[in-house]
Amino acid sequence: MSDHKEMLGTAPIGKLLFTLAVPTVVAQLINMLYNIVDRIYIGHIPGNGSLALTGVGVCMPIIMIISAFAALIASGGAPKASISIGKGDNDSAEKIMGGCFSLQLIISAILTAVLLIWNKDLLLMFGASENTIGFANDYMNIYAIGTVFVQLTLGMGAFITAQGYTKTSMITVLIGAVSNIILDPIFIFGFKMGVKGAALATILSQAISCVWVLLFLCGKKSYLKLKKQNFRIDGKLVFPCIALGAATFIMQSSESVISVCFNSSLLKYGGDIAVGAMTILTSVMQFAMLPMQGIAQGAQPILSYNFGAKNTERVKKTYKLLLVSCLTYSFIIWGAIMLFPQMFAGIFTPDTSLIAFTATALRIYCGVICIFGIQIACQMTFVSIGNAPCSIIVAIVRKFVLLLPLIYIMPQLIADKTMGVYTAEPVADLIAVTFTAILFTVQFKKALKSSTIENLKETTQ
């Protein structure tokens, strides 16, 4: 890890970001396949594929909540560990990781119990209809059992990335994705298990990835070791991690709340086809967003380490390169979606009527993702430098202050009420990006100035 530390602190930033970001981008693309491969196979189940796809789509809010709880711990814990490494405090970094591991086990047990007891009620609340509840219930009953594997794979995997081992993180995702792609057709079509087979394939794949992550963190190659003596939850170390991770948690968990609002409104105005289209829109949005998030995750160790080491010039250069990279990608993917919406919709279903409906909705829903690279770059930088308040504010404004009310306002302003619901997304995104850019410009300068002053004080003592 001494080589990794030297690399994070001294290597040319362009080459360093490329080295760290490529594996994380690949991992995010693989993760995207991992998340949507079930839907692709399910959408092609003979006879009732469209209803099955809609049913699994209703499960997505719950799955988002499970992932959000992993992010609550890891997205704050991993940057805090990186900052501690930058300060030379490796003991605290290992205690942070151990405490986060214990918290994830506790959260996994609670989530599993809640899902097994109230699964059907939650699915009905999240937009399942009498036509889709059977498929949704079958999927979630099995998926809930594998909650612990999801928590540990996502949560502890972040600590691998935080150390600069982005290739290992990529392998973690690759193992799970390949396993899922192989197991899905076997269970869905070979054993004729349908959506139950898709869920079983997913949790078995997550279990394999989980074993890989834990073996690495307990092994010789990991600089930060997962040790039994560090499993005690030290509030002074772990609670600041939760505060920092709250922004990511709000972003991800709010997706489930937003999904409920979208699904209920779409069911009201457009019926099952509108909800089915929303499942596809969410999948395409993941395709658009995950590579940007991968670039940002590749930048996180560089930003956190150098901020901890009070090397503000490298922090500024890394942010600028991150911003340019995210914006370039967001413009490219926006252009592809605008030009070929039918192609993206056709990946998920052979139903021509659903493809035609989705293609129109897709151009609306993804209308301003061309500038969303600004949002991703600013938010990841807030998290990477430990600015919990601003990262939380940005998350709350976009989801709760803007998008949530707009889901109900826009249908009243547009003649086609179904398309009005979809329009809420681009309107909210445009306002949110503007707000984030202004807030970041002010707060980033303050953070760098404060770090520079602290560095001068230390050098004069």
Predicted regions and their residues:
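Transmembrane helix-bundle signature of multi-pass secondary active exporters and lipid flippases
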Residues: 25-79, 143-150, 239-306, 326-334, ...
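Juxtamembrane/transmembrane-helix interface segments of polytopic membrane transporters
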Residues: 31, 35, 39, 43, ...
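Short runs within selected transmembrane alpha-helices of multi-pass transporters and secretion channels
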Residues: 74, 143-161, 169-177, 198-211, ...
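Transmembrane alpha-helix boundary and packing residues in multipass membrane permease domains
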Residues: 24, 28, 40, 79, ...
